[in-house]
């Protein structure tokens, strides 16, 4: 069961994670001086943690960007990496970035006053994209990508890259994520924030010890949306649990160990980032998500999970109609949102096969 929990947090397939063929990432810290956020607040220093796999070639044209998802680190795409997978590090240079608010990149928990804890500014998906654009262009001297691949909040970033920088990448892949957080998704996130902040220990974010009751309530509420209803009915959690594991034990594991060590303000910060995502609010589109999607120029592989409760396939189907060069390929899985991160062998194969084929075109 703990392997499954870790898999869902990091999106590191336990099958890929144990493979000797993975070229494990080298970790770096990129510092942006006086980083101005969309809200107008300026951080004297903003840190972006990232990892790299493989080597940048002399032409500097073999780079692939892998932006992280909710509370994940730079290891979140190892299910795609290695011999026999879609991303071969003997040929490609992979850059895996970490979102603001994950506890490693600049976050409420690791930033000094006056921006510590609940005073840390809300960071939008565009803030994250702009920071990574500076990393690529100014620090790594990469002005063009071979591909960009994102899962969940990484998919949100993929959509924003496609709109903000329509010529920056040859191809883009989005799995289990949409171009906008629609009202139902916003309500879900607010429910999870409410569960977390109801703990009196939370104290409006100025807590002196972790709000354990709130964190446990958050874990249970989040878990209810993670998989499909049929996944639970068929008890597919047994495929990754020790023999004899009970349903009560599964729930308790999610309640007490969902994101070990996570800071409550960090969790909330990234939920606010998620809530505000909308490519239609990019400058020049006046809030029109359809117009923003129509502006996407490059081939776009759109892979929603057929049973995702976070990003329903109906939302993805609606959006796909406005992307000129879309390949719409739903993942036929019962694993809900997690299907987009290869949470089981069948989904891992489906993703790798389709992404590898897309990148070869």
Model-assigned labels for residue ranges:
Residues 168-170, 174-257:
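Alpha/beta-hydrolase-fold enzymes
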Residues 296, 302-304:
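Short beta-strand/loop motif that positions the catalytic acidic residue
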Residues 309-315:
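Conserved alpha/beta-hydrolase "acid-adjacent" motif
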Residues 143-186:
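Conserved hydrolase catalytic core segment
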Residues 51-114:
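N-terminal cap/lid subdomain of alpha/beta-hydrolase-fold enzymes
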Residues 115, 126-147:
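Conserved acidic catalytic loop of the alpha/beta-hydrolase fold
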Residues 318, 325-361:
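Catalytic active-site module of serine/aspartate enzymes centered on a nucleophile-bearing elbow/loop
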Residues 17-66, 74:
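Catalytic-loop region of hydrolases
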């Amino acid at each position: 069961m703990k392997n499954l929990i870790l898999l869902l947090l990091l999106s590191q397939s336990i099958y890929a994670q144990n493979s000797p063929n993975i070229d494990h990432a080298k970790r770096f810290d990129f510092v942006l001086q006086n980083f101005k956020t969309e809200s107008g607040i300026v951080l004297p220093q903003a840190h972006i943690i990232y990892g790299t796999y493989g080597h940048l070639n002399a032409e500097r044209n073999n780079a692939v960007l892998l932006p992280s998802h909710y509370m994940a680190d730079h290891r979140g795409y190892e299910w795609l990496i290695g011999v026999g997978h879609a991303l071969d590090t003997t040929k490609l240079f992979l850059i895996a970035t970490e979102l603001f608010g994950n506890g490693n990149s600049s976050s409420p928990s690791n930033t000094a006053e006056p921006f510590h804890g609940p005073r840390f500014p809300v960071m939008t998906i565009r803030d994250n994209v702009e920071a990574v654009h500076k990393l690529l262009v100014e620090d790594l001297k990469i002005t063009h990508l071979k591909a960009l691949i994102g899962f969940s909040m990484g998919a949100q970033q993929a959509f924003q890259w496609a709109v903000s920088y329509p010529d920056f990448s040859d191809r883009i892949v989005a799995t289990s994520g949409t171009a906008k957080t629609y009202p139902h998704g916003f309500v879900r996130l607010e429910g999870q924030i409410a569960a977390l902040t109801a703990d009196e220990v939370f104290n409006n974010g100025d807590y002196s010890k972790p709000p354990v009751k709130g964190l446990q309530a958050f874990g249970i509420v989040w878990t209810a949306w993670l998989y499909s209803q049929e996944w639970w009915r068929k008890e597919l959690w047994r495929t990754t649990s020790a023999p004899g594991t009970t349903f009560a034990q599964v729930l308790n594991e999610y309640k007490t160990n969902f994101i070990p060590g996570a800071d409550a303000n960090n969790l909330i910060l990234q939920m606010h980032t998620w809530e505000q995502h909308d490519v239609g609010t990019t400058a020049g589109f006046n809030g029109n998500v359809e117009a923003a999607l129509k502006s996407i120029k490059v081939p776009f592989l759109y892979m929603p999970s057929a049973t995702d409760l976070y990003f329903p396939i109906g939302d993805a189907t609606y959006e796909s109609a406005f992307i000129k060069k879309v390949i719409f390929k739903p993942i036929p899985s019962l694993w809900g949102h997690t299907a987009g991160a290869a949470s089981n062998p069948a989904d891992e194969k489906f993703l790798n096969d389709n992404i590898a084929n897309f990148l070869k075109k």
